[in-house]
Curated annotation (Swiss-Prot):
One Pfam family this sequence matches: HATPase_c_3
Record key words, sorted: ATP-binding, Chaperone, Cytoplasm, Nucleotide-binding, Stress response
Subunit comment: Homodimer.
Region of interest called C, as start-end residue ranges on this chain: 555-626
Lineage: Bacteria, Pseudomonadati, Pseudomonadota, Gammaproteobacteria, Pasteurellales
InterPro entries on file: HATPase_C_sf, Heat_shock_protein_90_CS, HSP90_C, Hsp90_fam, Hsp90_N, Ribosomal_Su5_D2-typ_SF
A as annotated region, ranges: 1-338
Name the UniProt record assigns to this protein: Chaperone protein HtpG
Gene3D superfamilies per record: 3.30.230.80, 3.40.50.11260, Heat shock protein 90, C-terminal domain (1.20.120.790), Histidine kinase-like ATPase, C-terminal domain (3.30.565.10)
Principal location class: cytoplasm
Molecular function in Gene Ontology: ATP binding; ATP hydrolysis activity; ATP-dependent protein folding chaperone; unfolded protein binding
The organism of origin for this protein: Mannheimia succiniciproducens (strain KCTC 0769BP / MBEL55E)
Compartment(s): Cytoplasm
Function: Molecular chaperone. Has ATPase activity.
Length: 626
């Protein structure tokens, strides 16, 4: 019956085991939390399947987790009577990691123990955490609904391989036995185990029982009994007033498998047209796969306290995919499926309500705890920027949450909101001015800012890759248009001063110069014109309002899409000494060299690169040698 075979671990499992034992050793007691959490999940899955197949309970519907130890053998056992596993499932779940992006995750790990610990926690170590304290682990399991002789024994020393064989197992569920290392015998102590379970698993909605000794009236040991040691009431069903912050934090870690505390949470019970309870969390750290579109996200879904599914993504818009938590609805049917959820009025109403609550949470965090919000923005700001394109109904509320670097702060930290900017707008200023660039340094030092710096007009400095795309959906805020300072047809309106209005005479002197430049460059540029927006720079290139910007063209190129040709307007500063010098050159070849120099400088400042940098270097060298 044994049919024993020995298999090698998947490469990624080997790596994860080695890294985990090294990185998580200082927080080793979490292995018990992880194993109890898995047992709780197994019970949830059995309850769900038994909705349509009650015979799976096999006459034992009293679901629980049990913990026992044998100090003589040095073993600790965690068992449950949940869904159980077949032989194939044991191999799939315990011998391989099925998550997409695992290789990328492992490559992100380095030698920083604290950082690695956080990353591994986010990835979800689950069962493998047993090897932090054990040098051998045995798993005995039988799936619900299969014969007793279809049990499986999986065993490993956590090194390169594991064995798997068929066994007879009378009881449904899974039993995990840890053979503890010599220096981990502290976990063979009932009070130590009670302490850990009280700390990490008191909120589990499943009884956690420990095998404890019984004593007679004379104090002599008379036997053993199973004793429940947790509240065994689903945390979200309890009154908010009786739940401590620590309990909320530990429950977050239970449902998210994160090691870090959440930044914020909101617990609501709603009655009326809809009846549901929601418990939403804002994590403190972005998961390693936040930008992996294939990775599932969403809330845990319960219907009338019965677990239905993990990652019910339909209740949260994609731009809030970082939110964690659960929804317990009284209005959805118990036999609900992902397909039914997709096209359901109740679902749509719940999604709308939960989106609103999530945005309110973030608004409150930004207002009441700006330091925590700064952490949130650093971790999740890029994802939130997708919101104005996805959620038109909440566009203004989402944009209110955005933060940017600004010329006002002289710092790369993104901590300026649109409301901050508007509160500092100059008298007569009608627009919110911004610039997009590849980096904060490039934005801050752009020649397009020279006039704004001179006049003391604040400009938002945007350097995230998504910014240009975001701005194509967000053209105004609070009735104020958002205006790029790089546009050729930039209009400062009432902020234009008399000095600029009286420069026509000077412009006329340069008319013939401008015509020479136009003739020389021809179709290479859209237009050539005099500009007074520059103070220290001889020339810039700019695009019209209806043209694709440089940053958007770069986005297209990076995504492999065809990029329309961008023809720039060449703007020349008549006050600059280089321009004055070029205007005096009569030799057409030399004049062409000077104009080529000015145009290439402007293109380099705008785009960050040139099509032919070698030719530009030769040109600069030739002019310097004269």
């Amino acid at each position: 019956m044994s049919n024993k075979e020995t298999c090698g671990f998947q490469t990624e499992v080997k790596q994860l085991l080695q890294l985990m034992i090294h990185s998580l050793y200082s927080n080793k007691e979490i292995f018990l939390r992880e194993l109890i959490s898995n047992a709780s999940d197994a019970a949830d899955k059995l309850r769900f399947k038994a909705l349509s197949a009650p015979e799976l309970y096999e006459g034992d519907g009293d679901l629980k987790v049990r913990i026992s130890f044998d100090d003589k053998k040095g073993t600790l056992t965690v068992s449950d009577n949940g869904i159980g596993m077949t032989r194939e499932q044991a191999v799939d779940h315990l011998g391989t990691i099925a998550k997409s992006g695992t290789k990328e995750f492992l490559s992100a790990l380095g030698n920083d123990q604290a950082k690695d610990s956080q990353l591994i926690g986010q990835f979800g170590v689950g069962f493998y955490s047993a090897f932090i304290v054990a040098d051998k682990v045995e798993v005995r399991s039988r799936a619900a609904g299969v014969a007793a002789d279809k049990g499986v024994l999986w065993a490993s020393a956590g090194e390169g391989e594991y064995s798997v064989e068929n066994i007879e197992k009378k009881d449904r569920g899974t039993e995990i036995t840890l053979f503890l290392r010599e220096d981990e015998k502290e976990f063979l102590n009932e009070w130590r185990l009670r302490e850990i379970i009280g700390k990490y698993s008191d909120h589990i909605g499943l009884p956690v029982e420990i095998l404890t000794k019984e004593y007679d009236e004379e104090g002599k040991e008379s036997g053993v009994k199973w004793e429940k040691i947790n509240k065994a009431q689903a945390l979200w069903t309890r009154s908010k007033a009786e739940i401590s912050d620590d309990e909320y934090k530990e429950f977050y870690k239970h449902i998210s498998h994160d090691f870090a505390d959440p930044l914020s949470w909101m617990h609501n019970k709603v009655e009326g047209n809809q009846e549901y309870t929601s418990l939403l969390y804002v994590p403190g750290k972005a998961p390693w796969d936040l930008f992996n579109r294939e990775q599932k996200h969403g809330l845990k879904l319960y219907v009338q306290r019965v677990f239905i599914m993990d990652d019910a993504e339909v209740f949260m818009p994609n731009y809030l995919r970082f939110m964690r938590g659960l929804l317990d609805s009284n209005d959805l049917p118990l036999n609900v499926s992902r397909e039914i959820l997709q096209d359901n009025k109740t679902t749509a109403a719940l999604r709308k309500a939960l989106t609103k609550r999530s945005l309110q949470m973030l608004e409150k965090l930004a207002k009441d705890e700006p330091e925590k919000y700064a952490v949130f923005w650093k971790e999740f700001g890029l994802v939130l920027k997708e919101g104005v394109a996805e959620d038109f109904a909440n566009k203004e509320q989402i944009a209110k949450l955005y933060r940017f670097a600004s010329t006002h702060t002289d710092s790369s930290e993104q901590n300026v909101s649109f409301e901050d900017y508007i509160s500092r707008m100059k008298e007569g200023q009608k627009a919110v001015y911004y610039i997009t660039a590849d980096s904060y340094v490039a934005a801050k030092n752009s020649p397009h800012l020279e006039l704004f710096n001179k006049k003391g007009i604040e400009v938002l400095l945007l350097s995230d890759r998504i910014d240009e795309w975001m701005l194509s959906y967000l053209t105004e805020f609070d009735g104020k248009p958002l205006q790029s300072v790089t546009k050729a047809d930039l209009d400062l309106g009432d902020l234009a001063d008399k000095e600029e209005e009286n420069q026509k005479e000077q412009d006329e002197k340069f008319d013939s110069f401008i015509q020479r430049v136009k003739s020389l460059l021809g179709e290479r540029v859209k237009d050539v014109r005099i500009t007074h927006r520059l103070t220290d720079t001889p020339a810039v290139v700019s695009t019209d309002n209806d043209q694709m910007t440089t940053q958007m063209a770069k986005l297209f190129a990076m995504s492999g899409q065809p990029v329309p040709e961008v023809k720039y307007t060449f703007e020349i500063n008549p006050q600059h000494e280089l321009v004055k010098k070029a205007a005096k050159v009569t030799d057409e070849t030399e004049f062409g060299d000077w104009i080529e120099l000015l145009l290439n400088q402007a293109m380099l400042a705008e785009r960050g690169s040139l099509e032919n940098p070698v030719a530009f270097i030769k040109l600069v060298n030739a002019l310097l040698a004269k």
